[in-house]
């Protein structure tokens, strides 16, 4: 099961399905990431963000996109960076492995293994403090993963830069990936080669 369209409930006053108050905020970027991670963790097999790019719909500008309309030079919004990073490293037909992070109320995570045996871990920390976490995966007990992080300060401010660069590489040590997840951040770990 899944969801054909998702967005937030931060409607304008008066309410409009074509505009929301958080579309240009980092809060929206975190919401989109947490929604995607929690949806996958709960068993969703598909989801689609509404609307990918600003466009006219029945004569009204749908001002909800991951990027703005041509009159704003197709400027990328903060949620573009979290959504595109997640979709870049989650392959169709991947096996999804849920996690149990009950002791970390602000951290959510899901693991995916693609048909080629490569792994991606998606994590988000919506809390105000960093969290330490050890990820143990019996099917990935040695090797390393590329680490990508999104924070409010790491999002390119020009609205034109297309992606988030790898921040570093994390290696499995003693069967675990030992991580520090920054406050209010999204992290993607993967051994899928960047394209």
Mark where each language-model region is.
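Aromatic/acidic polysaccharide-binding cleft in carbohydrate-active enzymes
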Residues: 3, 7-109, 115-116
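C-terminal beta-strand-rich structural cap/linker in extracellular carbohydrate-active enzymes
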Residues: 163-195
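Ser/Thr- and Asn-enriched, surface-exposed coil loops between beta-strands
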Residues: 97-103, 115, 127-129, 168-177
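Carbohydrate-binding surface patches
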Residues: 102-142, 150, 184-190
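C-terminal accessory region downstream of the catalytic core in glycan-modifying enzymes
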Residues: 135-169
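Internal hydrophobic scaffold segments of catalytic domains
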Residues: 37-40, 44-47, 133-138, 144-146
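Hydrophobic, well-ordered secondary-structure elements that form the walls
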Residues: 39, 47, 83, 121, ...
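Surface-exposed, flexible loop/turn segments at secondary-structure boundaries
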Residues: 9, 55, 129, 153-155
């Amino acid at each position: 099961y899944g969801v054909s369209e998702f967005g937030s409930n931060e409607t304008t006053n008066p309410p409009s399905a074509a505009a929301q108050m958080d579309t240009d905020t980092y809060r929206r970027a975190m919401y989109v990431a947490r929604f995607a991670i929690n949806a996958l963790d709960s068993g969703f097999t598909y989801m689609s963000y509404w609307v990918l790019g600003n466009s006219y719909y029945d004569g009204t500008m749908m001002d909800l996109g991951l990027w703005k309309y041509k009159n704003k030079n197709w400027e990328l919004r903060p949620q573009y960076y979290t959504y595109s990073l997640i979709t870049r490293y989650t392959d169709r037909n991947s096996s999804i492995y849920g996690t149990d992070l009950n002791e970390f109320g602000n951290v959510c995570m899901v693991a995916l293994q693609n048909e080629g045996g490569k792994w991606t871990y998606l994590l988000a920390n919506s809390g105000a403090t960093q969290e330490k976490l050890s990820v143990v995966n019996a099917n990935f007990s040695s090797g390393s993963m590329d680490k990508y992080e999104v924070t409010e300060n790491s999002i390119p401010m020009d609205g034109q830069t297309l992606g988030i660069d790898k921040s570093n590489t994390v290696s499995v040590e003693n069967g675990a990936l030992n991580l520090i997840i920054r406050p209010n951040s999204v992290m993607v770990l993967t051994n899928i080669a960047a394209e």
